[in-house]
Amino acid sequence: MTTNTVSRKVAWLRVVTLAVAAFIFNTTEFVPVGLLSDIAQSFHMQTAQVGIMLTIYAWVVALMSLPFMLMTSQVERRKLLICLFVVFIASHVLSFLSWSFTVLVISRIGVAFAHAIFWSITASLAIRMAPAGKRAQALSLIATGTALAMVLGLPLGRIVGQYFGWRMTFFAIGIGALITLLCLIKLLPLLPSEHSGSLKSLPLLFRRPALMSIYLLTVVVVTAHYTAYSYIEPFVQNIAGFSANFATALLLLLGGAGIIGSVIFGKLGNQYASALVSTAIALLLVCLALLLPAANSEIHLGVLSIFWGIAMMIIGLGMQVKVLALAPDATDVAMALFSGIFNIGIGAGALVGNQVSLHLSMSMIGYVGTVPAFAALIWSIIIFRRWPVTLEEQTQ
């Protein structure tokens, strides 16, 4: 059975299963944001000290995305997915059993290894397995899985951690991954590597200034976002003085707003992708600047989180669409680079938030985040004027 002869129903089932996998991988990456206080309490540490776990995870992904992708470039994709899921599940069992913070960090590094490979191949696999003429919808489903990780995954993970302990959150993610793995084994055909690219692809990609500019924009804007977002849970409780339940609700609201951003991008992205991304970066800048002033009211923080969530979803979708459009001949290499660069931004933002919290005040995370956000806004305006046609290739 090949991907060309299967029924549309089976083809969609494969894409949906990949979207569920995307949901699980994004949930485990983001869920520590909602568990920092609980993990810190468990190991008798400061919240800011535990936060370094976010940076380690993100930078391992950043460092290993391209090497792992190149090492596995000729490996049949079904076998590769099964292997990385086994590593992913085993690492979550270790997270559940963690008897020290060091062991927890080691388990997260194992998850990061699996993550590094998964995100470099997922978009291209979704396109390959989609029914004829439905590639855009397949990518949209993967993006929906990503969005739902913010909408449901992170808040549910926090709720489980709140009532059953943070270890159970990681255990539940491992169980979800096991079920998904069984579905993948049943549904996926043999998937020989295609358009994976190689080291020979790198000089070609590096000679594309529009693509390199998108990568730079990605790392700067993601740094801005994660400077504040990494510590939003302790910020809400310790700086704003609101309850743990409100922190959970706020994470749910911020994630849910991402669905609105996805709908907006779906309707307007084909014609106005560049303008949407620049507008979203400007909106992120405003949200970060108003984070501390909004902390005096639950309503103000709630409204701010809605706009924040919308902005980040539009930015994330816009960056991914442009990368895929600018490197159709080496999608796996381009997406491995994108995943690595995105995670450099996550790690940098979490580290900046960590240092601000330790040496200045956690109340300052929003203000500090405005610096890279402003730089990203200026850069986006420059590059979208410099390469207006190239960056809109995906609309043709």
UniProtKB/Swiss-Prot annotation:
The keyword Ubl conjugation does not apply. Keywords: Cell inner membrane, Cell membrane, Membrane, Sugar transport, Transmembrane, Transmembrane helix, Transport. InterPro entries: MFS, MFS_dom, MFS_Efflux_Transporters, MFS_trans_sf, Sugar_effux_transptr_put. CDD domains: MFS_NepI_like. The chain crosses the membrane at residues 15-35, 50-70, 81-101, 103-123, 136-156, 170-190, 209-229, 246-266, 275-295, 299-319, 333-353, 364-384. One of its GO terms (cellular component) is plasma membrane. It is found in: Cell inner membrane. It is a multi-pass membrane protein. One of its GO terms (molecular function) is carbohydrate transmembrane transporter activity. Its main location: membrane. Involved in the efflux of sugars. The physiological role may be the reduction of the intracellular concentration of toxic sugars or sugar metabolites. Belongs to the major facilitator superfamily. SotB (TC 2.A.1.2) family. This is Probable sugar efflux transporter. It comes from Escherichia coli O157:H7 (strain EC4115 / EHEC). The gene is sotB.
